[in-house]
């Protein structure tokens, strides 16, 4: 198949008026009735899965307009429930209080993932990030992963072009990530 398609996933954070995580993901799932909307690891995260578009001159405009439409719908639900929709890499206001099992989305998939990764490690998850400050911790579950969200682009290409395009994507990943990272704070540490 020579048709090139592009799609995306937009992860987002739900926050309350004081910018702390809002654990009301279920309200959005129920009220939106949107097949492109799905849960994420934590009760304060959601994900919009955009449909794939044929990669032609207007593919990015279609992606943007579809995403804006979905975000607008979610923000209307948020307005009715004192919740803001936030697109950010790392939520700078997150605290350890939100990284416990009560904040995990109740889904057997996430519980199984946590159990599997814990059993493979046979220890806590070690986190060590050096920046202006240093964050060094051992966390007992996978919820530390819920601190960050992303915008992921998916590109479907012809099989014979995969190696070249994959290598190209690896070359640009670091500078794109460096320029797109938007929160230097995690657990009160300057990273």
Model-inferred region functions:
Residues 1-191:
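Phosphate/nucleotide-binding catalytic core
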């Amino acid at each position: 198949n020579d048709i090139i398609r592009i799609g995306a996933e937009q992860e987002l954070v739900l926050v309350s008026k004081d910018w702390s995580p809002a654990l009301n993901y279920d309200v959005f799932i129920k009220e939106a009735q949107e097949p492109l909307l799905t849960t994420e690891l934590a009760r304060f995260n959601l994900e919009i899965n955009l449909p794939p578009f044929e990669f032609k001159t207007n593919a990015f405009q279609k992606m943007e307009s579809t995403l804006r439409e979905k975000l607008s719908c979610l923000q209307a639900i948020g307005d009715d429930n004192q919740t803001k929709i936030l697109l950010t890499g790392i939520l700078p206001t997150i605290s350890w209080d939100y990284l416990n099992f009560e904040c995990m989305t109740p889904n057997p998939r996430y519980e199984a993932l946590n159990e599997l990764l814990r059993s493979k490690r046979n220890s806590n998850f070690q986190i060590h990030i050096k920046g202006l400050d240093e964050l060094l911790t051992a966390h007992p579950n996978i919820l530390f992963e819920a601190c960050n969200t992303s915008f992921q682009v998916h590109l479907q290409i012809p099989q014979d072009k995969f190696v070249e395009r994959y290598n190209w994507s690896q070359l640009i990943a670091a500078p794109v990530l460096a320029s797109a990272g938007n929160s230097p704070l995690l657990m009160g540490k300057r990273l």
